Design a protein with these regions (language model features):
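Flexible, solvent-exposed coil segments and beta strand-coil junctions
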Residues: 40-41
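Extended, low-polarity transmembrane helix blocks
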Residues: 1-29, 36, 45-53, 57, ...
Length: 129
């Protein structure tokens, strides 16, 4: 990886993971509404605490560059599943746009899974020890 790519990799990790950090925190403050929305879409609401934990912890892990391949794989699958489960009404332009956004983010996480966290990451420090 070239020098500029080493410096820019953390910015990419922040940009791709930030949405999950914010959404995980927002799910806490809107817990009842999110649980109901999940239930109405056929997803058991008892999964919500796990989703919140994984969104917040996974986002922080990617931002810090820790276990990036593992959490990128999780978010890759998560983005595809949420697109299919919650945004499958293509007659609704908003659902269609969110579906495509989720699929695009899945592509970004797949790329991160393939290439790793980069030089400025906790994963990189672990490999030096």
């Amino acid at each position: 990886m070239t020098n500029y790519m080493n410096f820019l990799s953390p910015i990419g990790r922040i940009l791709i993971a930030n949405i999950f950090l914010i959404d995980g925190i927002n799910k806490i403050s809107h817990y009842e509404g999110v649980a109901e929305w999940m239930f109405l879409n056929g997803v058991p609401d008892f999964l919500l605490p796990l989703v919140i934990l994984l969104e917040i912890f996974g986002a922080l892990a990617i931002i810090l560059g820790w276990r990036v391949k593992l959490f990128s794989l999780f978010f890759f699958v998560f983005c595809i599943l949420t697109a299919i489960i919650f945004h499958r009404d293509f007659t609704n332009n908003m659902d269609k746009a969110i579906f495509m956004k989720n699929m695009s983010m899945a592509g970004g996480f797949f790329f991160l899974f393939l290439h790793g966290a980069g030089k400025f990451s906790l994963d990189s420090l672990k490999n030096k020890v």
